[in-house]
Amino acid sequence: MNILFYDMGSYTYQDTLYYLKQLGHTCKTVYYHFPDKFHDDFFCDRFEKQLQSDSYDAVMSINFFPLIADLCHAHQIPYLAWCYDSPLEEKLEEYFSYDTNHIFLFDRIEAEYYQQLGYSQVQHLPLAVNTERLDKLQFSPAQIQKHRCDVSFIGHLYESPLQVLLYSADDYIKGYIEGILQAQLRVYGYYFIDELITDELLDSVNQSFRKVGQTSLTLNHRGLSFAIASEITNLERCFLLEQMGELFNTHFYTTKPHSLSDHVISLGPVKYMEEMPCVFRSSRLNLNPTLKSIQSGIPLRALDIMGSKGVLLSNFQPELVEYFEDGQDLILYSSMEEAVEKAAYYLQHDDIREQIAQNGYEKIKESFTYPDRIQKMLATI
């Protein structure tokens, strides 16, 4: 196939492009960074000219872009969007109904949600890892020593808007939402926040905005759900890092400032292609506290850890246990306290930990390959 690829610096672009070409497809890439992904006349003009300059069988991107969906629909060209972000921004849904769309989400529950709304163009497809590239990486003793630690986490602490949203709410509303938050914080594998956000609760929150003159702000169900999920994720990640930092040599790699204690060694960001695999391989345990609103799927971080022959210490995710066995291929926890307990145990058992790393890698190499995922996407056209 002749494929036009759009990219704005996504993590998985290079690996996807490599395997598209390995499978015999011709690819041309348009690079562009959207100031506003919903309105951009310059991009639309440039991209449309590119579409008209050749006979393309499909357009592809990592993550979904509404302007590309518009243009592909206008030209009746299939648009394949493979997403590693979840949950998707709510406004994107307005563009899902085009018959030219082929949207692939790694979270099965999120994909089923859109399918139940009638968007048959949305499908479930797990992410992939390029173990061929990772196997070729070689790290110097200095690089390994720099990143050698007991526990590491690459990511960020979510800045939830929840406290701002509830600033003008009465004590009952604040207490009710705090109860939801504390309950969900302790439950893994089942996301019940959506069930507890009633129309009456939303109406009360929105009335509290109007009482203080915020007439332009209206919060919907998904907005409040994501705010609560982000707050929970922030609390969980802070707790885990603080606890791990007090007990073990713990590294935290992030692009944003934070207020964690000095027990946690902050080393700033790392480059995805070159440095991140070294972190995963050099760390004795790699944390993966998943964003709470990712209800079932396996995030890219978890797959990259195992694909780099790192040991994954993750919260329970339904799709993880479909492919991997706890204590054999990875280490799962069902509470924050259990995460700390399991970290202490496995840090004392190097041989078990090393076997887990090898087993997880073999499962990734077998079941999470780019050729398989690409062929499944192209088969939908």
Positions of predicted regions on the chain:
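N-terminal pre-catalytic "stem/leader" segment of glycosyltransferase-like enzymes
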Residues: 1-75, 222-226, 250, 370, ...
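Catalytic binding pocket for nucleotide-activated donors in carbohydrate/polymer assembly enzymes
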Residues: 4-7, 11-14, 18-23, 28-35, ...
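Short acidic active-site motifs
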Residues: 46, 68, 91-92, 274-275, ...
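Histidine-centered beta-alpha loop that forms part of the nucleotide-sugar donor binding/catalytic region
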Residues: 64, 83-87, 108, 126-129, ...
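Nucleotide-sugar donor phosphate/pyrophosphate-binding loop at the beta->alpha transition
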Residues: 80-95, 105-106, 133-135, 220-221, ...
